[in-house]
């Protein structure tokens, strides 16, 4: 009874207390493959060449995919579609860890071996470390196709700041910095993708934005035959809003026609 004035229990409390609830990593399916991503070693570099031949030849590997294998749109993003799902040849990496290729294999150990066999040739470029550097007129462009590094600009004016400062008894001018903060949820990000009985790709995900996951997976695959079901979420704090493994697991399932589990390591 959800009427005002009635006491209600959390809808997920029973399955959590009894241990029957499932997080994505608790899902296992017959013939399930394990996915990993080869990630950029450089925060800003141009990818010149990707050689996946040796990885594809490794026993137990079912798929090695690059940007060329994406059937829909490579670029996704919640606010603006400017984030590469997989960095293509000729494209720029944007941070340490940008995905360049994904591998699906019979087990994670084999997938990790295959990852080490992929050869990538980079042109390492100067990277941008601060907002101030990025906003400078002569800053290297983060995105080739953009005029500059300013995503949006808005001017806000409230009151008379100069007058307020002039009439203040004390005025302190200083530069303050705070450290980076990791969301540090207990559960690493994980997704399991498979074809369901309707012939749709079903993604079991642990994220905070199931509708965005659905939209961006559909965009990547070039089809609306995608479903997203949120499993239990082991913490998020805003850190599980963007795509990390969901769309890549879906892509590997699309290519292999098999269930695929993909999970970030704690280091990732």
Residue spans of the language-model regions?
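A generic local secondary-structure boundary/capping motif
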Residues: 25-26, 82, 90-93, 161-162, ...
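FAD-binding glycine-rich core of flavoenzymes that anchor FAD
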Residues: 251-267
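General beta-strand structural signal in soluble alpha/beta enzymes
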Residues: 19, 63-68, 95, 172-176, ...
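Short acidic loop-to-helix transition motifs that present clustered carboxylates
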Residues: 69-72, 178, 186, 210-211, ...
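Helix-loop-helix junctions that connect adjacent transmembrane helices in secondary transporters/permeases
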Residues: 140-219
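Short secondary-structure boundary/capping elements
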Residues: 85, 181-185, 244
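Alpha-helical support elements that line or immediately flank enzyme active sites
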Residues: 37-67, 102-121, 191-256
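Flexible, low-hydrophobicity surface segments
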Residues: 1-148, 171, 255
């Amino acid at each position: 009874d959800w009427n005002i004035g009635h006491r209600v229990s959390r809808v997920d409390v029973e399955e959590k207390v009894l241990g029957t609830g499932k997080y994505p990593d608790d899902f296992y399916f017959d013939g399930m493959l394990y996915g990993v991503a080869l990630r950029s070693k450089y925060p800003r570099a141009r990818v010149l060449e990707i050689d996946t031949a040796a990885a594809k030849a490794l026993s137990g590997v079912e798929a090695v995919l690059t940007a060329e294998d994406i059937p829909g749109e490579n670029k996704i993003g919640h606010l603006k579609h400017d984030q590469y799902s997989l960095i293509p040849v000729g494209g720029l990496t944007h941070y340490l860890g940008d995905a360049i290729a994904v591998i699906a294999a019979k087990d994670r150990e084999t997938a990790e071996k295959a990852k080490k066999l992929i050869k990538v040739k980079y042109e390492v470029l100067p990277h941008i470390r601060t907002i101030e550097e990025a906003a400078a007129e002569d800053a290297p462009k983060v995105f080739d196709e953009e005029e500059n590094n300013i995503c949006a600009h808005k001017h806000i004016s409230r009151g008379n700041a100069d007058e307020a400062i002039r009439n203040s008894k004390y005025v302190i001018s200083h530069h303050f910095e705070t450290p980076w903060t990791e969301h540090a949820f207990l559960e690493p990000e994980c997704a399991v993708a498979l074809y369901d009985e309707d012939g749709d790709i079903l993604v079991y995900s642990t994220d905070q934005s199931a509708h965005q996951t659905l939209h961006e997976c559909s965009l990547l695959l070039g089809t609306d035959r995608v479903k997203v079901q949120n499993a239990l979420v082991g913490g998020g704090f805003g850190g599980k809003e963007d795509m990390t493994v969901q769309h890549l697991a879906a892509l590997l399932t699309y290519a292999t026609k098999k269930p695929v589990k993909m999970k970030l390591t704690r280091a990732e």
